[in-house]
Amino acid sequence: MLKKIIIGIVLVLVLIQFIPLDKSNPKVDESISLHTDENIMKILKKSCYDCHSNETKWSIYSKIAPLSFKIHSNVKIGRAALNFSNWKDIKQDIKIARLKRAIKTVNNKMMPLSAYLSLHEEARMSSDERKILVKWLENELRLIAPDEVYF
């Protein structure tokens, strides 16, 4: 009986490898993507772009189910929440809300996700990088909505 269960589990794990997931990156239109200070871009690309842009670097383990399902879902959710590749196309009221949320999540060390950091230690932000990024996010917020109270 135990042998049949193990064979069944192995069979399921093999079969789910054939479930297709779109791991391509949509084309990046440079005219609408984020362009800002080089230091900010360096932090964003290191710590945020895999989930929050159309420039995801799909790792080898992102092709292995069931882990691939979770990674694909996280990228899809991340892009929907805030996509730096579509920065200039985001409506102002939505951008304000997303900037506020980004400030909160970066300040509270909720981003990058701990599961992501466990596999990508290089994406971890130093406290200085976190402060620099939050300051930039706050400045972006002030630029697009100077009369609004944020914090």
Name these PLM-found stretches.
Residues I60-P66:
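Short cysteine/histidine-rich zinc-coordinating motifs and their immediately flanking basic loops
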Residues H35-Y49, I71:
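Sequence/structural segment immediately N-terminal to covalent heme-attachment motifs in c-type
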Residues M1-L34, L137-F151:
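Post-cleavage N-terminal segment of exported redox proteins
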Residues E38, K42, D93, A123-D128:
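Soluble non-cytosolic domains of exported or imported proteins
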Residues L13, S24-H35, F84-D89, S114-L119:
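Sequence context of c-type cytochrome heme-c attachment sites
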Residues K109-M110, L117, E121-E148:
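C-terminal capping alpha-helices of c-type cytochrome domains
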Residues L44-E55, M111, L133:
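The canonical Cys-X-X-Cys-His
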Residues F69-L119:
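Extracytoplasmic electron-transfer domains, predominantly the class I c-type cytochrome c fold
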